Swiss-Prot record:
It is a peripheral membrane protein. This is ATP synthase subunit beta. GO terms for molecular function: ATP binding; ATP hydrolysis activity; proton-transporting ATP synthase activity, rotational mechanism. Pfam families: ATP-synt_ab, ATP-synt_ab_N, ATP-synt_VA_C. NCBIfam families: atpD (TIGR01039). PROSITE patterns: ATPASE_ALPHA_BETA. Keywords: ATP synthesis, ATP-binding, Cell membrane, CF(1), Hydrogen ion transport, Ion transport, Membrane, Nucleotide-binding, Translocase, Transport. Belongs to the ATPase alpha/beta chains family. F-type ATPases have 2 components, CF(1) - the catalytic core - and CF(0) - the membrane proton channel. CF(1) has five subunits: alpha(3), beta(3), gamma(1), delta(1), epsilon(1). CF(0) has three main subunits: a(1), b(2) and c(9-12). The alpha and beta chains form an alternating ring which encloses part of the gamma chain. CF(1) is attached to CF(0) by a central stalk formed by the gamma and epsilon chains, while a peripheral stalk is formed by the delta and b chains.
Amino acid sequence: MSKKSVGKIVRIIGPVVDVKFQEGDLPDIYDALVVINPQTGKKLILEVEQLIGDNIVRTVAMDSTDGLVRGLEVENTGEPIKAPVGRGVLGRMFNVIGEPIDEQGELKDIEYWPIHRPAPSMTEQKTEIEILETGLKVIDLLAPFPKGGKIGFFGGAGVGKTVLVMEMIRNIAIEHHGFSIFAGVGERTREGNDLYLEMTEAGVLNNTVLVFGQMNEPPGARFRVALTALTIAEYFRDVEGRDVLLFIDNIFRFVQAGSEVSALLGRMPSAVGYQPTLSTDMGELQERITSTKKGSITSVQAIYVPADDITDPAPATTFTHLDATIVLSRQLAALGLYPAVDPLDSTSKILDPNIVGKEHYEVARGVQEVLQRYKDLQDIIAILGMEELSEEDKLIVQRARKIQRFLTQPTHVAERFSGIPGVYVPIKETIRGFKEILEGRYDDLPEAAFYMVGTIDEAVEKAKKLMKSAVI
C-alpha cells in the first residue's frame, strides 16, 4: 500500500488520463486515484495502469472523463478499488466501484475488499468433482456442470444466451437455495433492467447480487466490473463457506473493453487488433474462479462469438479455461428448438463414466450417436426422401427427431411470452426419459408430444391428448 499523495492531470485521451506526481510520491500499479469532475461535482475514480517516466502515471477512468481539464488536482488513495462484501450486499445492485445504483438506501453489515486479489494456492483448492444439477435436460445429460467449474455459453447474437443464464439464476436460487452473483459486462442496459425486474417478480433477488458495467459505460468500467463481482463471490466462498454461482454476461465484452484501452495505453495490438496481454488478462480473472476446501465458485459465462467465428482470439482464449462448453446453435433456434443447445458440439470434461456413472454416460453417448447418424442421413433424405432409407435408418431418424424435441424444455423466465409453464427436471428423470426413448418404448408416439415438455411422463400425457384431439 503506497502513501497518500496529490498529483495533477497533464493529459487526457478519452478514458485514459496521465497524472504527474512529485518525486517520491508515485502511486503503485492498480492504486485508485480520486479527482472531482468540475462539470458534475462528482468523484471520478482513476486506476493506475502504467508508470511512464518523469513521475507520470497513466490511468484508466472508471466513468466518463467529460469535463476534466489539465491541471486538476488528483488524490492518490494509496489502495486499489474496493468492493463491498458481506450479507448486506444481497439483493442489491452495484457499479464497478461498489456504489449501490438501485436507490435502496445505504449498505449495512458490510466490509470492503480490494478487487485485485491473488488466486487461491494449489494447496487450498479442492480436487474432488461433483455435478451441479441445473434442471435443464440438455445440459444435465450431455454437458453436465462441475461444481466449482467454469462453463462457457457460446453463441452469436439472439440465440438465447441471456435467457439460459437467467433461467439458471432462478433454478439455483429456488431449487438449491444458493447465492448468485451476476456481472453485467458491456451488455444492454435494458437487459439488466429486465433481469432486475424479473428477479424481483420471481422472488429470487434476495439471494442475488447484481454488478453492472454496461454498454453505455467507459471501457475502464467494463474491464473491471467482472473483478468487482468476483470479489463479492470470493467473500461468500472464503468467509461463509458457500457454494456460489457467478454469472458473467458477457465475457467477450471484458476482452473488448481491454482492447479499447490497450491502444490508448500505448501497447502494440496483437492478432485481430486485440491487446497483447489478452491471455494474462483472462488468466487473472479465470484463475480466481475455483473450488477451495471452504466453498466453491461455479462460473457460467456467456460468450459472444463475433460473426459466429469460434477461432476469433477472444472466444479461443476463453476456451482454454473452461470445464464445459455449451454451444448455442442458430439453426436450432430457427427451428424453435429452445434451449438452442447443440447436442453434438456441446461438451463437458466430466462426462466420464467414473464421475457421472455408467448409466448416465451410456445414455448420453447413445443420444449423441443417434443424433449424429440422423445428421449424416440428412443429405440422403434431402435428395432421395425418407422412402429410400433402410428400415433401421428410418427408425433412427424417427427416434432422433423425438430426442431433438425432448431436448427442448419450457423455461420459467420465458413463461411470460411463451405461455408455457417452466419446468425443472431432476437428472434421474432426464436419464430415465432418454433411456426409454433409446430403448424404443415410445416409437409409436407422435414426435410433437415430446416438444416443450419436462419429464417423459409429461410427453406420454401430451401424446394421449394429441391422439384424442386427432380422433375428434
